[in-house]
């Protein structure tokens, strides 16, 4: 029987250049990427804070809400750290619906119906969500929370703006936090 040998690279022992040039990492991001090298040079610092979502996305990734590419999302903080952050944005109404289902769907039913009820709840829950979980930049995720706060009681506390709705009320600039337009958020 033929044998197959799989070589798993030890990225931890490689220098940044070796990781950057490896076929498995060539189009991914990390402290070793060409983009990171460029950002460190541009912002004149070696300090970076990259999260896993940033590192696991393509160098060409673009935020679906503000349309900025990663090179325009990264920004330097007042403390001299380059923030490279992407966030998983989801509809919190789905969380609220899930809580209601957990509290009510299984009361007073025999154990024999529990599995069937659980399947039914799993099938219904996505109908309560206005949009699927989406990766967005840190500034769009923050703009969602800030706009909900600005609107106060005019929106349900578990309401979330979709990425396209966020894109409609923000003013995006390269390497800066977003500004918001309350009029466009209503």
Put a short name on every predicted segment.
Residues 60-67, 137-140:
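Short cysteine-rich clusters marking metal-coordination/redox-active sites
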Residues 52-62, 82-84, 129-133:
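Short metal-coordination and nucleic-acid-contact micro-motifs, chiefly zinc-binding Cys/His arrays
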Residues 113-178:
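Polybasic, low-complexity binding patches
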Residues 43-46, 57, 68, 142, ...:
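A positional "C-terminalness" feature that preferentially activates on distal terminal regions of long
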Residues 4-33, 66-67, 75-79, 99-103, ...:
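Long, compositionally biased low-complexity segments enriched in polar/charged residues
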Residues 70-131:
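Histidine-centered nuclease catalytic patch
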């Amino acid at each position: 029987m033929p044998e197959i040998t799989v070589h798993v690279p030890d990225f931890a022992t490689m220098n940044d250049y070796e990781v950057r040039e490896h076929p498995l990492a060539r189009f991914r991001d990390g402290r070793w990427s060409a983009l990171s090298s460029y950002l460190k040079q541009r912002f004149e610092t070696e300090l970076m804070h990259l999260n896993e979502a940033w590192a696991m996305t393509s160098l060409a990734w673009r935020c679906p809400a503000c349309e900025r590419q990663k090179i325009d999302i990264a920004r330097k903080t007042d403390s001299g750290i380059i923030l490279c952050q992407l966030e998983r944005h989801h509809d919190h109404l789905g969380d609220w619906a899930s809580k209601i289902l957990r509290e009510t769907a299984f009361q007073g039913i025999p154990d024999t119906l529990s599995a069937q009820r659980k399947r039914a709840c799993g099938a219904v829950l996505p109908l309560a969500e206005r949009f699927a979980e989406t990766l967005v930049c840190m500034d769009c995720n923050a703009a969602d929370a800030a706009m909900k706060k600005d609107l106060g009681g005019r929106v349900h506390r578990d309401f979330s703006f979709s990425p396209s709705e966020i894109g409609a009320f923000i003013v995006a600039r390269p390497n800066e936090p977003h500004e918001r337009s309350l009029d466009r958020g209503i």
